[in-house]
Amino acid sequence: MLSMKRRGAARLAAAVVASGLVAAGAIATAGTAAADDTTPTHGGATATLGGLKTFDQAVVHNDGGDQRVGAGLFEMAVDNGGTLQTYCIDIHNPTQQQAKYQEVPWSASSLHNNGDAGKIRWILQNSYPQVNDLAALASKAGAGNLTEKTAAAGTQVAIWRFSDHVKVDAVDPAAEKLADYLEKSAQNLGEPKASLTLDPPAVSGKSGSKLGPVTVHTNADSVTISPAAGAPAGVKIVGKDGKPVTSAAEGTQLFFDVPKGAADGSTSLTAQAATKVPVGRAFTGIGEHAKSQTQILAGSSESTVSAAATVSWKKQGAIPAITAEKNCAKGGVDVTAANKGDEAFRFQLSGKDYEIAPGKSQTVTVPVAEDQPYNITIKGEGGFKKSFSGVLDCKTAGSGGGKPSSKPSPASVGGSTGGDKGGDLAETGSSNATPMIAGIAVVLVVVGGGAVFFLRKKKTGTA
């Protein structure tokens, strides 16, 4: 196992200092002319794909013939420190070289409508690398002798049978017996919780009060809370008791304490922790790598995870907080506008007019085609403007009849195959340095005014 505890605190401290996070995917703004373009995010781990590292061969049986593919464990380097191991859950879609990934809930991935998603999690928890006693694993499966490569291949094959529902066999007989055992034994388990999220990621309200709450959800023992650099004087991050907060844990409620008479403005906070990402969390490509093969977590070292939340305040008038997140079940992006002001918030979204009364919120689901780049813009009174961009990737490529990739990882086919002697992550000896990904170059298509919307209305919680 990679021992990260001695370096975890140092990594986290460095990450807090280095991080210039703005709450991507959420904005709360009091300005009369705010314009931002963000990608919906969920918080948690972000990482760069290093390639297929521990693998053997498998054969996919298609109507057009058989195709041999690599099957096994991928490796990712976590931003600001940490290493992840993952399996593929999108066999027909290749990975992209040095693709950037983010941790997401199943609802924002191809698992959203997969009734076998829980069986995949069972396989992950009951096979390699979580089970690293290969002799014991082989005995259970009646597989003879297993190596790290064949154990990884058999595990991947079993996962594909549930993630993509394809006919696929491992080439190695022992790996095939392991795959059959895992497939027959798998039970449906629940979705694992996120490593770190903040809910909601944007709040708003009148100055002279505590604005929030923003609730911390995490599996980490402790989370470091940091205000944005250059936060307005007098604005504090506090708990329910009104005392300043610099650390938090699961369930902690955070508030932005804005002094009375403060000039209209906005700021944000960053939450960061060092923890192991739960096995079974989904990872999807982001930015220019949004269409890269979807992955699912098999093992994690202690890794840096983060989330952010924004706040805005005014003395009077409409005070909106806007958030967006993918909704794979409805095939679109949920845009939620909450208004904590004393006047209605009026805005346009894709050619339609909306009005949110004080103390209310409304969610609009904007339909987006699968694999379609989108640029969704909200325009409000006084020059208010907010845009969300990305690519909707909610289905396995097999849904469109694509052929499986013979090279699941063009980035790196090969590498080390280390063994884990007692924990979550097989030792790979990878570097913690994470390559920086250059800017996003995606052609964005504005969602037109002719789109159909699904609406939900609800009261916002009290501050």
What are these regions (language model features)?
Residues 1-36, 435-459:
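Secretory targeting and sorting signals
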Residues 2-6, 404-444, 460-463:
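Extracellular Ser/Thr-rich, low-complexity/disordered mucin-like segments
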Residues 29, 221, 265, 341-343:
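Short loop/turn segments at connectors of secondary-structure elements within structured domains
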Residues 36-166, 172-188:
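Short, surface-exposed polybasic-aromatic patches that bind anionic ligands, especially phosphate groups
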Residues 64-68, 81, 203-207, 248, ...:
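Short, ordered beta-strand-loop transition motifs
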Residues 167-319:
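Acidic/charged, solvent-exposed loop-and-adjacent secondary-structure segments enriched in E/D, K/R, S/T
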Residues 261, 276-423:
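Membrane-proximal extracellular "stem/stalk" segments
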Residues 337-359, 427-463:
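Conserved, compact domain cores that house catalytic/ligand-binding motifs in diverse enzymes
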